[in-house]
């Protein structure tokens, strides 16, 4: 009951509690999806309250963890984090959310992300955030020792299709900051 009280009302004095709950969103959703849908997820909606949404997305961004069911619930508001203005307000949290965006694309499938919204999100990221996202992808290529995680297999089946579908082609957003992870990707594969 106390948990519901802290989550369910919109009192600003309870916002720090909601931020902490947001940092454990995946865990809470796995334990009780109905309670989470009813009392926590509404605070992630940008159209409801920008200040509240910014706070809980920053909490979620401390250690973002996604599973396919949760992703389906939050992806629209998640992509809205990368709109002009909001991405700057998120500060360093934008980097961890960018990595979570890459993870969602690589692990949940290309069809779960709208192409234009995803390309727009990546385009609006600063070069350091895009480079961090690419470094995360390099890590995804080089983790593991079995066939399922062979870098060439991961490249061919997940990373290359993701890049082809979502990475913006605009030469205006390219930067030297992003060059190193592209090279590391090339070196990790044959």
Model-derived segments and their meaning:
Residues 1-190:
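Non-catalytic all-alpha helical scaffold/repeat segments
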């Amino acid at each position: 009951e106390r948990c519901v009280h802290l989550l369910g009302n919109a009192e600003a004095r309870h916002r720090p509690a909601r931020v902490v709950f947001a940092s454990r969103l995946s865990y809470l959703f796995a334990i009780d999806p109905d309670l989470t849908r009813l009392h926590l997820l509404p605070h992630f909606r940008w159209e409801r309250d920008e200040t509240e949404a910014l706070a809980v997305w920053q909490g979620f961004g401390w250690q973002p963890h996604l599973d396919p069911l949760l992703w389906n619930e939050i992806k629209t508001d998640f992509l809205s984090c990368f709109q002009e203005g909001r991405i700057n307000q998120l500060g360093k949290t934008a980097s961890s959310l960018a990595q979570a965006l890459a993870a969602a694309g690589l692990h949940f499938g290309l069809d779960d992300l709208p192409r234009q919204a995803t390309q727009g999100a990546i385009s609006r990221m600063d070069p350091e955030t895009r480079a961090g996202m690419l470094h995360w992808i390099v890590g995804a290529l080089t983790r593991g020792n079995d066939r399922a995680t062979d870098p060439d297999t991961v490249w061919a089946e997940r990373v290359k299709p993701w890049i082809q579908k979502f990475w913006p082609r605009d030469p205006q957003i390219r930067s030297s900051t992003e060059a190193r992870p592209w090279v590391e990707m090339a070196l990790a594969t044959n």
